[in-house]
Curated annotation (Swiss-Prot):
GO molecular function, one term: translation release factor activity, codon specific
Keyword Cytoplasm annotated: yes
Name listed for the protein in its UniProt record: Peptide chain release factor 1
Keyword Cytoplasm attached: yes
A GO term from the CC aspect: cytoplasm
SMART domains xrefs: PCRF
Residue numbers spanned by region Disordered: 287-306
Amino acid sequence: MHASIFAKLEQLSMRLEEVDVMLSNPKVASDVKKFTKLSIERAQLTPVNQQFQAYLSHHRNLEDAKLMLLEDDMDIKAMAKEEMLDVKKKLDHLYLELKKSLLPKDPNDSRNIIIEIRAGTGGNEASIFSSNLFKMYSRYTEKKKWQIEVISSSLGEHGGFKEIIARISGVGVYSKLKFESGAHRVQRVPETESQGRVHTSACTIAIMPEVENIEEVNINMSDVRVDTFRASGAGGQHVNKTNSAVRITHIPTGTVAECQDGRSQHKNKAQALLVLASRIFDLQQQEQHKEQASTRKELIGSGDRSQRIRTYNYPQGRITDHRINLTLYKLSEIMEGNLNAIIEPLIVEQQTSQLTELNDVLS
């Protein structure tokens, strides 16, 4: 193990001891905010420390096996060689896992998200596909035991959505779905196509970390314009006689958010403000990533919402993620919400890239 990694793991082990001492303090236990913060830190440190202690234990076993090689008995030597091979495999695996645990953490990974799905090129077929994608993410959310709540939607003229915005909440939502931002292309025969020709259309998805409170973004309410209007349905017809729909504009950035799905103007305003704050926060994050030039490339592509990231080919039952050249013939399964087959390889690709950078630094 590299000396700098060993030193870092020792620091984390010592920090865990400090946290345990603080958590046993009655004064800390009575401070809910501090107790919760320390409990979360302990939950993060514990698995890393367990792996580190296991590594140290196996390393001691390896040293014992080396001593056994000095014995005259050939059977003992054979046992020692076998033991060393087994222990080295375990050490290599643990070392890789420990290096992963020390990789830079995305501070937004624990956040909930705002997901926006917009129909792009392809007219009615794009609107229908946006509905298919929303159902796919809804089913994935259900499998993960997360919660999904529609904030705003605009119906297509012949089904589906021109746009749908939703909030997904739960444990580690952003960490799993952050790579879904980009252009999603579909190739299939529309139901209205009499000649059986395959059409290509697309939807754009934006995944934004949700702000926990508006103060995070520091929005000056004097810079915000609030407009109210009547909610509308498919084709633009008004479905509400009161001005319950709300559009909020952040004048300095030109960022706009609106909500009309809630029953009251008050709820729609609160939801629109949440989306507005999350959009501004996301813009700030993107600017930071541009300054850290290599970061976005490392995160499976540029993060550009216009970048085509995935193709869904229905005639072939094929789905391709262009960022990592991954092709799976499991389209129907994935559209049913079984997204792990495509999400996990993206996470592995990111970790592999980060490990390569770490190894370059250590070498």
